[in-house]
A protein has these predicted regions:
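Polar, glycine-rich mid-to-C-terminal structural blocks
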Residues: 239, 251, 258, 262-330
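Peptidyl-prolyl cis-trans isomerase
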Residues: 2, 21, 112-117, 361-374
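Structural motif
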Residues: 72-74
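Residue-level recognition of conserved beta-strand edge/terminus positions
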Residues: 78-79, 110, 296, 343
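Cleft-lining beta-strand/loop regions that shape enzyme active-site pockets
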Residues: 1, 24, 54-57, 63-70, ...
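N-terminal activation segment of mature serine protease catalytic domains
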Residues: 1-21
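PDZ/PDZ-like peptide-tail recognition elements
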Residues: 7, 19-57
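Conserved functional hotspot residues or short segments at active or partner-binding sites
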Residues: 292-293, 297-374
Length: 374
């Protein structure tokens, strides 16, 4: 009966907006843990290379690093069961490696230049998940900060990075939100607050059953006079768009890159008794100028909505600013009277086309063959 209900619920939600969703109990914890700042596991990033688990990265401070695992180790056995040679599903492997805190998993490892398997008993524990991936002085006096998500620990990581960069002599900042699909709104609001004086509108929410709610800066920011640039792309979404929109509409800095994703729906999480969760859309996010961040959609037409990024690519939007169609009916003004446009997502002040000089198909084939890891 439970499975019947779980099979029927997605049909119900398909008639709602594209982001209202039901998450089964078995997936709910995983859906939330990336934003919580840590999870219980062994602390490795891995990939399936042909039919073997290849450790790509060992998370600093995690259980695997403490046990002695290294990048490019190959996991052959897990708890004495063979996982090499049978093309195991990546999701199954992940669930096997994760588990209750303080439980132990035995790994059989093949390491370069070691003739025999090495065995490690790894005690699962809290694995830190960083959301500020990197921060450094990119040029004299200019600090660069890459924020990959807006999680529970993001703001603290961010102000720590700012403090270190200031100590190194940085007086202006580049905030990189490319590929940042969002997270907690509060983290984005707190970050915006660092760059603005008191009384500036950051964002407001409004819905049919929810009256307008404005969020303002409180004047406690430590970088109120520091020049700032924000980097965005088509995968910058949700909280990334709140941050970018607030900076742009308040004329606090420049947005450089490409139009953002266009996800601006306020969702209310509803925890169900069996551990499953409903995320129900209740309102929309608006930038200070009044732009709705959410791109347009039609109820019940999720497939068209999901094709939006592909259609933007096909129309040349990632390669040429001229391919972006600006609608004068969606024209708004910043605090200083600059024109900005709505219609979904945040339009950059300076357009940068996608990088087409990256990885070649030949290089991809070499990596997939395993030749670089011999």
């Amino acid at each position: 009966m439970k499975q019947l209900v779980e099979d029927a619920i997605p049909k119900v939600f398909s008639e709602l907006d594209p982001h209202s969703v039901y998450i089964p109990a078995k997936d709910a914890q995983r859906a939330n843990e990336d934003l919580e700042g840590s999870f219980s596991g062994i602390g490795v990033s891995f990939n399936m290379q042909t039919d073997t688990i290849l450790v790509i990265n060992v998370i600093p401070g995690g259980p695997s690093e403490k046990a002695g695992l290294k990048p490019f180790d190959r996991i052959i056995t897990i708890n004495d069961s063979l996982y090499a040679g049978n093309k195991s599903d990546q999701e199954v492997i992940m669930k096997t490696l994760r588990g209750a805190k303080n439980s132990t998993v035995k790994l059989g490892i093949k390491r370069k230049n070691e003739p025999e398997l090495l065995y490690f008993d790894v005690t699962r524990g809290d694995v830190p998940i960083s959301s500020v991936d990197v921060s450094y002085e990119v040029s004299k006096g200019i600090g660069y900060i890459k924020v990959s998500k807006f999680g529970r620990t993001t703001y603290n990581e961010f102000i720590t990075a700012i403090a270190k960069l200031k100590q190194a002599g940085c007086t202006s900042f580049v905030i990189d939100l490319r590929g940042n699909t969002g997270g907690y709104m509060d983290a984005a609001i707190n970050m915006v607050n660092e760059f603005m004086p008191e009384g500036r509108l950051i964002v407001y929410t409004e819905g049919k059953a929810f009256p307008r709610n404005d969020v303002y800066t409180n004047g406690t920011g430590t970088c109120q006079d520091a020049p700032i640039v924000v980097l965005t792309d088509e995968f910058s979404a949700s909280a990334s768009e709140i941050f970018s929109g607030a900076i742009q509409d308040n004329d606090r800095g420049l947005i450089i890159g490409r139009r953002t994703f266009g996800k601006g729906l306020v969702q209310s999480p509803i925890q169900l008794s069996d551990g499953s969760e409903i995320r129900l859309t209740i309102a929309r996010y608006y930038t200070p100028s009044g732009r709705c961040i959410q791109k347009k959609y039609e109820l019940g037409k999720d497939s068209e909505y999901e094709q939006d990024i592909y259609q933007r690519f096909m129309h040349g939007e990632f390669d040429s600013a001229d391919s972006i169609k600006l609608n004068n009916s969606e024209k708004y003004e910043t605090v200083m009277g600059r024109p900005v446009y709505g219609g979904g997502g945040i339009m950059p002040d300076i357009f940068i086309p996608r990088d087409t000089s990256g990885v070649t198909s030949y290089f991809s084939n070499v990596v997939n063959s395993g030749m670089l890891n011999l």
